[in-house]
Amino acid sequence: MSIMVNRKTTAGGLVAAALLFSSTALAQLTEKPPLHGNHWMAVTGKPLAAEAGAQIFQKGGNAIDAACAMLGAVCTMWDVLSWGGETQALIYNPKTGKVIAIDALGYAPTGATPAFFKAKGYNFPPEYGPLAAVTPGTPGGLCYMLAEYGTMSLKEVLAPAMEMARGYAIEAQTANSFEAGKRRLKEWPYSKAIFLPHLGQKREAPEAGEVFVQKDLLETLTKMVEAEQDALKHKKTRKEAIYAAMDRFYK
């Protein structure tokens, strides 16, 4: 980029022109560039989750296998994208030229009626806590995508997430989020036990880089994988076995 400056421009005008050039050039330098890959690409908001997708690609998995692995990993390590939430996905099929939409939204529990909430003193469902939650949609969405459009087993794609649940070095962003929200986390025993391992200390959440363990989540994922593997032992197809894992979670 070049800037034409009139010889009669004042010193102030030159400074303004220079500042304009600097800010514009900086914006161009810091703008996220297009990314390209020869064979595949794995992109998420968390580097470790992107690595999970890369591992699946390197093992011969397709884009859906990698996406499911990244989804599992992100839900394990990002507090605002958890296994208890919901998932939406768009899948482009190059063979048909069509886009498939996956809307894995959770159902409201059958007991979540207006009468139920009014009996507890609420005019509306609360904004936070167990009574605000729907049935988790993410586990079902992941299993459906993998069963219908993937090629690998649930055991393979959940391996990175399960490894993280055993313990990984937590990032500053997530750890600080726990600390900032600790007043609300203390309202629920299980949340307090998992996310605030240093109760009573000045900082009750994990420190950045501390090994963060989620043993209950690991147990849940293990039960799903065990259901899949048991179905495979009984001569079920890959797809049937994944749906058996989904049933293990919901039923």
Region roles according to the model:
Residues 2-14:
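Bacterial N-terminal signal peptides that target proteins for export
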Residues 14-20:
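Hydrophobic helical h-region of N-terminal Sec-dependent signal peptides
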Residues 22-24:
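N-terminal signal peptide c-region/cleavage motif recognized by signal peptidases
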Residues 5-6, 18, 130:
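Exposed boundary/loop context
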Residues 6, 26-27:
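Low-complexity, intrinsically disordered segments with a bias for serine/threonine
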Residues 28-51, 55, 62-251:
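Noncatalytic scaffold domains of N-terminal-nucleophile
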